[in-house]
Each structure stands twice: as C-alpha cells, then as structure tokens.
UniProtKB/Swiss-Prot annotation:
GO terms for molecular function: ATP binding; ATP-dependent protein folding chaperone. Residues 613-627 have a biased composition (Gly residues). Belongs to the heat shock protein 70 family. This is Heat shock protein 70 2. Residues 609-643 are annotated as: Disordered. The modification N-acetylserine is found at S2. Acts as a chaperone. The keyword ATP-binding applies. Gene3D superfamilies: 1.20.1270.10, 3.30.30.30, 3.30.420.40, Actin, Chain A, domain 4 (3.90.640.10), Substrate Binding Domain Of DNAk, Chain A, domain 1 (2.60.34.10). The keyword Cytoplasm applies. PROSITE patterns: HSP70_2 (PS00329), HSP70_3 (PS01036). Disulfide bonds: none annotated. It comes from the Eukaryota. It comes from Pichia angusta (Yeast). The gene is HSA2.
Length: 643
C-alpha cells in the first residue's frame, strides 16, 4: 500500500486524502474535522496551525496569518495584493518586489515568505496524514487553481519542498474534482462535464470530456481572486456601515472587533444557504457596545450580486474555447464550499436553461479526493479503478516570446494539452547582431507589455551576418506540472542556452529553499519541545492536586501524625503556588519540582501503606498517580478534563 497522499491546500481550508484498498479516505485532523483552516499563528511561546490558530485569531490578529494563497507567487505591487493588504490584520512588507509577512514571534520580529506560511499549513496536513497512517508521509500530489500562472505553481511546489514533501505532481483543482466525479462512472460513452469550482479565495471553470477513464480537459478559465472571502468582505463592510449608522462609531481601526465581526459574517453566510434570514449577536463588539442585528438572504444576494454574476463569464469563455454549445454539456459539477450558496446554484442552472447541477460529490472534499487518486497512480498503486485512468490537462495561459516592436509571438496557445513541446525558428533583427535576448511571456494580449514576463535569457556569440540570416530555434517545453522550460539554439554554431522558467525575480533560490527547510525543522523541534514542557507542567499540576486530595481523606488523618500531615500539606500547597507563578518554566524544572514532591510524599505515604493500602490508590502506587506521569515515563494519558 502506498503512503502517497493528495493535498488540497485551499485559500481558507485545506484537506488531505489517501487512496487504499480501492477507495479514498479523507483524513480527519486532531479535532476530528475533515477540513483544516489554512491558518498559522505566532505567539510569545509557540507556533500554532489549523484550528488552534484560527480559534485564537480574535485575541492575536496581528500575528495570525491566513490567505497565504492569495499572496503566493505574486509581486508586491500586484493590484490584487495591494487590495488584500488593506483587509489583512497582519503586516505585509515589500522585500525585493515580493510580498512577505511580518509577525512578532517569541518576542522577536520575524518575516516569512508566503511559501513558508503555506508550507506550515502543508506540514499540518502532512502530520494529520501521518498520525492516521501511522508512518511518515513523503510523497504528495498538491492541487492548485487551474488558472494559477507559472510563478504561482512554482511557489506552491516550493512550499511543498519546505514542508519536507516530495511533490510528485501539481494538478489543477477542477481536474482533481473531475476525477472524484468520474472515477465510478465508467461506461457511459463520452461525457462533457463542466466543473464549476468556487472556493474560499479562487474560482475556476474547466470543461472536460470523460470517456473510458480518459479525462481530457478541453478548456479552462477562471479568476484566481474570487471566492467566499470576497462575499464575507461585502457582509463585513455592510455591518461596519450599519454599526456606524446606529452608534456613530467606526470599528475599522480595531482588528479584534473586525475579526469577531468577520467570524460572525462567515457563520451568517453559511446559515443563509439553508435559511432565509439569520441574526448576528456579538456582545461588546466595540467600546462595550453590543451589536445585535439580522440579515436576510435577499439582502446578502443583493450585496454580492455583481460578484455572483461575474462567475458566469468564465463559463461562457470555456464553452467558446472548447467550441461547445451549452446544450452539449452533459453534467455540471459544483465544487468548493461557496457553491452551496443557493443564488450561485440558481445562476448556473438558469445559464444552462434550467439544467440542475450534479450534487453527487462533496464540494469540500472532491479536490483532495481526486489528488489522492492521482497520487496512487503516480506511485504505481494500480487498482481496478485506477489502472485505466488517464489525465490530459491543459496550459491555462498562452506562452510566447517578444519579437520586434514588442509583439507577443505565441508558441503555445492557451488550452494546449500538456505535457507539450513546441519549436519555432526566429532570426536577428539587425545586421551583424552578436546576440539575441529571448524574453518569455504568458498572457493573451497582443503586446508583451500587457502580458506577464516570466523570465529572459541571452543567446550570445552569433557570428556576424546580415539581418534575417542566422537561424535561432526556440523550443518551449511544458512538463506535466504545467511548469515551463525554454531553450534556444543557434543552428549555425550549435550554441545553446536554456532557462527553466523559475521566475527569475519571484522564485526562491535553491539556497533559500534549503534555509527554509532547515528553519521549518527547527520550528518543528521547538513545537515538540513546547508540547513536552506543557505535558510536564500538566503532569506536575495533576500530581500535586491528587496528593492534596489524599490529605483530606479520613484515613490520612487517622494514620499520619499531625506534624507530618502539616508539612506534607504545605509541600503540596507550595508546589501549587509555585506552579501559578512559574507558568513558563522548563520541562526539567517541572520534573525536578515533581521529584521533590515525590520525596515529601514518600515519607508520609509510607505510614499509610504500612497500615494496609489506601482506597482509590493503584496497588503499589499513590492515589491518582497513574494518571499523571512525568515526561520521563510515558504510560497513561497526560490530559485532564476541565469542566
């Protein structure tokens, strides 16, 4: 059985799955949830991720990081990044043109790249899988929005490396969802399936034809910056204005109030998918003022109507690109939590002349499900279900080079099936030109200045010749991850240069990745040390209380003389008082303190045992002692329930 997993690293929530014994298992985290918030938080003492990080967001807004996926692989001056920064409670700084996240961690100012934050979320998913599978997990297939560009894909791959994963493949989210939908549907002839994937932060539409286990993507389109969070933002702004109207106060400057309001808005949005109205009740939201209000589904739909409508543009685009009429679409599959919104479902259904979307797959889990199937295939774990499965994905954006006059000359048009390789011959622009600059762009516009520069390289040493004579063959090669290699050869001399488009400016260098990997390991060790410290503290605390309880038992008073009794009770009380004052002591200090208490206890408890055992005590042990081992012995649980 292979231990490869599929990870859907979402903008707001992530999910991990594993394929074994002919079925996919979605793996629940330590809280029992099948999806985990893509949150990382930094405090004075520790680093938190997942549910633990999200749950303390209101108390620690400046150091709780989320939405790394909206920053990954982008430039700092990207208008969308600038728009997001206005909403973020944490600080985003410009480091050589890239956005980085600045937080306070253990009393120091730290700066992290979006890749590092994403890697922490991926590490959390990796650990979730490891505790379920009972073994280390190295191999993973990670999904990205279909409309992610080259640098966003590379950055996602880097995040996986930093998390200590071997990223076997980067696959597109809608394609993964299509596998989840089509895995059990074998013999229905060719089906055109439209995947409508509206998640927490990104939106994709892909049109596939599925036939006999072959999943061929015909076209893809989307918006890497549209999702449930944008709907939350509309609600948050609506309620900020309402609060202003009612109380003449603006809560915009108070991050804690904004976080509490946002959490309430997320909840309200979810409720409005199943009821027509919901109320928000937030006690003491701002300056002691309670905020009680309500919102109807109709009002919510009106607040977001332009966003909802804009989801249909990519649908029209994929139909046009795939040269299909809407009547030729056999199934519409909804993926992503935001497709639970009734208005979104209705818009899609109306667009397809009343055709009902297919709801046979879980919108939150479908992407991880498909990624797990792909991971199993790549590790050679063939079962009857997967052996005939073939994925043919496409490049989402056209790729080309700049030619004279700033013209974009496309070598690979968008929606070309990948992996693919394409060569074209170019020449020099002026007489005796000694070299050419090859600039690689992605995008759909006619002029390169309107497209995205991926990278450039120089091919020099061309022998002097009139313009148009030298033959320079440029080859574009896209691998299965959608990542591009470009090479150029001067035919006369055989001189060649090549570049893996790793986004010169944007991509992390090998050294940086190695540094981040070792830092990630260091943080992990610190996290484990902190967990050990907490266990020692809790162990000492419950031990001290259980001994103290013994002192109040009747037998104790009867069998132990008063002076010993008082000394022992004082030792227990002193330990408890010491614990209150030393919340941040080391594991060793807690263990030493425990040994002192054990010695004091041994003296007194000998008298008790001599008289023939103690009720409630384990044979040969102190009452309650089995339940709170020190960190050196690991028998028994180290957790106690607090009412």
């Amino acid at each position: 059985m292979s231990k490869a997993v599929g990870i859907d690293g979402g903008t707001t929530y992530s999910c991990v799955a594993h394929f074994a014994n002919d079925r996919v298992e979605i793996i629940a985290n330590d809280q029992g949830n099948r999806t985990t918030p893509s949150f990382v938080a930094f405090t004075d003492t520790e680093r938190l991720s997942g549910d633990a990080a999200k749950n303390q967001a209101a108390m620690n807004p400046a150091n709780t990081v989320f939405d790394a996926k909206r920053l990954i692989g982008r430039k700092f001056d990207d208008p969308e990044v600038q728009g997001d920064i206005k909403h973020f409670p944490f600080k985003v700084v410009d480091k050589s043109g890239k956005p980085q996240i600045q937080v306070e961690f253990k009393g120091e100012t730290k700066v992290f790249t979006p890749e590092e934050i994403s890697s922490m979320v991926l590490t959390k998913m990796k650990e979730t899988a490891e505790s379920f599978l009972g073994t280390t997990v190295k191999d993973a297939v990670i999904t990205v929005p279909a409309y992610f560009n080259d640098s966003q894909r590379q950055a996602t791959k880097d995040a996986g490396l930093i998390a200590g994963l071997n990223v076997m493949r980067i696959i597109n989210e809608p394609t993964a969802a299509a596998i989840a939908y089509g895995l059990d549907k074998k013999s229905q002839g060719e089906q055109n399936v439209l995947i409508f994937d509206l998640g927490g932060g990104t939106f994709d539409v892909s049109l596939l034809s599925i036939e006999d286990g072959i999943f061929e993507v015909k076209a893809t389109a989307g918006d890497t910056h549209l999702g449930g969070e944008d709907f939350d933002n509309r609600l948050v702004n609506h309620f900020i204005n309402e609060f202003k109207r009612k109380n003449k106060k603006d809560i915009c400057g108070n991050q804690r109030a904004l976080r509490r309001l946002r959490t309430a808005c997320e909840r309200a949005k979810t409720t409005l998918s199943s009821s027509a109205q919901t109320s928000l009740e937030i006690d003491s939201l701002y300056e002691g003022i309670d905020f009680y209000t309500s919102i109807t589904r109709a009002r919510f739909e009106e607040l977001c109507q332009d966003l909802f409508r804009s989801t249909l543009d990519p649908v029209e685009k994929v139909l046009k690109d795939a040269k299909l009429d809407k009547s030729q679409v056999n199934e519409i599959v909804l993926v992503g939590g935001s497709t639970r919104i009734p208005k979104v479902q209705k818009l899609v259904s109306d667009f397809f002349n009343g055709k009902e979307p297919n709801k046979s797959i879980n919108p939150d889990e479908a992407v991880a499900y498909g990624a797990a199937v792909q991971a199993a295939i790549l590790t050679g774990d063939t079962s009857s279900k997967t052996q005939d499965l073939l994925l043919l994905d496409v490049a989402p954006l056209s790729l080309g080079i700049e030619t004279a006059g700033g013209v974009m000359t496309k070598l690979i048009p968008r929606n070309t099936t990948i992996p693919t390789k394409k060569s074209e011959i170019f020449s020099t622009y002026s007489d005796n030109q000694p070299g050419v600059l090859i600039q690689v762009y992605e995008g759909e516009r006619a002029r390169t200045k309107d497209n995205n520069l991926l990278g450039k390289f120089e091919l020099s040493g061309i022998p002097p010749a009139p313009r148009g004579v030298p033959q320079i063959e440029v080859t574009f090669d896209i691998d299965a991850n959608g990542i591009l290699n470009v090479s150029a050869v001067e035919k006369g001399t055989g001189k060649s240069e090549k570049i893996t488009i790793t986004n010169d400016k944007g991509r992390l260098s090998q050294e940086e990745i190695e540094r981040m990997v070792s830092e990630a390991e260091k943080y992990k060790e610190e996290d484990e040390k902190e967990a050990k410290r907490i266990a020692a503290k809790n162990g000492l605390e419950s031990y001290a209380y259980s001994l103290k309880q013994t002192t109040s038992e009747k037998q104790f008073e009867e069998k132990v003389e008063a002076s010993k009794r008082e000394a022992f009770t004082k030792a227990c009380d002193d330990t408890i008082a010491w614990l209150d004052e030393n919340q941040t002591a080391t594991a060793e200090e807690y263990d030493d303190k425990r040994k002192e208490l054990e010695q004091a206890g041994n003296e007194v408890l000998k008298d008790l045992y001599a008289e023939g055992g103690v009720p409630g005590g384990a044979p040969g042990g102190f009452p309650g002692a089995g339940g709170a081992p020190s960190t050196e012995e690991t028998q028994g649980p180290t957790v106690e329930e607090v009412d």
